[in-house]
């Protein structure tokens, strides 16, 4: 005796709904592994779960009617759909059991899954609200406790940016000859150019010391500002000595003449 085809289709639909019932876990929605996973596409001819949950009687009668009309094609689709759903449900149960036993595995699985934005935040604009308290002391709420320093104490006295060196830095005076000044500037430019070209610069002599400068100022100079030679200095000293002697001689002769004149006047006045 053959069974009615409607009865067989009804049993298949009932088994399908039993497999399709969602599994309820105690974990929240953001810790569930299925969060953010795109649902798989269902083949044509498979009834939806929402209609069966909302009105089970009407959906069940509709499923039976559609299954009886489709025939062998719907039977094949139901078989493949049930096999895939059974495999996915068993895999989810196994994964849930392993995660409950091994917390490190659950954390690794959570990191492997792509981060999906929650649906309630999709489509909303996020704006930055300005801070109402502009001062560092929370709008004057902590003013009664006195002034408080913000920052690490050892770094409070340090400058926070580069400072330029003063232009009037104390340097030792440099004494050079007036005629050598242009040559000194020319050599300085040549040394600066050589430094830019990374050439070897030989050691230069130091500038004149202050004591030597004072000694040079005391030395006798000839015509043109040059230092006088020793012979010229001696000749100049001899000439100066002779001039001094000549001047002293003239002064002494003049004094003697004045004395003789005065004596003559006295003698003439005393005579009868």
UniProtKB/Swiss-Prot annotation:
Motif (Subunit association domain (SAD)): 175-198
Pfam families the record matches: CBFB_NFYA (PF02045)
GO MF term list: DNA-binding transcription factor activity; transcription cis-regulatory region binding
Biased composition range(s): Basic and acidic residues: 229-247
Protein name: Nuclear transcription factor Y subunit A-1
Annotated Gene Ontology cellular component terms: CCAAT-binding factor complex
Expression tissues: Ubiquitous.
Record note on quaternary structure: Heterotrimeric transcription factor composed of three components, NF-YA, NF-YB and NF-YC. NF-YB and NF-YC must interact and dimerize for NF-YA association and DNA binding.
Bias type Basic residues, positions: 211-221
Compositionally biased spans, kind Polar residues: 46-61, 82-92, 248-257, 263-272
An example Gene Ontology biological process: regulation of timing of transition from vegetative to reproductive phase
DNA-binding region: 205-230
Localization per record: Nucleus
Keyword terms, alphabetized: Activator, DNA-binding, Nucleus, Transcription, Transcription regulation
Main location: nucleus
């Amino acid at each position: 005796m053959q069974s009615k085809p409607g009865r067989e289709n009804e049993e298949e639909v009932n088994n399908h709904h039993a497999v399709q019932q969602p599994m309820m876990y105690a974990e929240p929605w953001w810790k569930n592994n299925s969060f953010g996973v795109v649902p798989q596409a269902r083949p044509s001819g498979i009834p939806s779960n929402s209609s069966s949950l909302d009105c089970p009687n009407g959906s069940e009668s509709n499923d039976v009617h559609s299954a009886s009309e489709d025939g062998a094609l719907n039977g094949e689709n139901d078989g493949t759909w049930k096999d895939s759903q059974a495999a996915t449900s068993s895999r989810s149960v196994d994964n849930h059991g392993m995660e409950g036993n091994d917390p490190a595995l659950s954390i690794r699985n959570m990191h492997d899954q792509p981060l999906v934005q929650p649906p309630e935040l999709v489509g909303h604009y996020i704006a930055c609200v300005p801070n109402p308290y502009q001062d560092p002391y929370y709008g004057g709420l902590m003013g009664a406790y006195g002034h408080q320093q913000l920052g690490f104490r050892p770094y409070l006295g340090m400058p926070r940016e580069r400072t330029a060196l003063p232009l009037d830095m104390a340097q030792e005076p440099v004494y050079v000859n007036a005629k050598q000044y242009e040559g000194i500037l020319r050599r300085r430019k040549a040394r600066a150019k050589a430094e830019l070209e990374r050439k070897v610069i030989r050691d230069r002599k130091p500038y004149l010391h202050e004591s030597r400068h004072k000694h040079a100022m005391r030395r006798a100079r000839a015509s043109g500002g040059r230092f006088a030679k020793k012979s010229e200095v001696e000749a100049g000293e001899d000439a100066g000595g002779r001039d001094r002697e000549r001047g002293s001689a003239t002064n002494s002769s003049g004094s003697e003449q004045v004395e003789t004149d005065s004596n003559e006047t006295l003698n003439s006045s005393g005579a009868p």
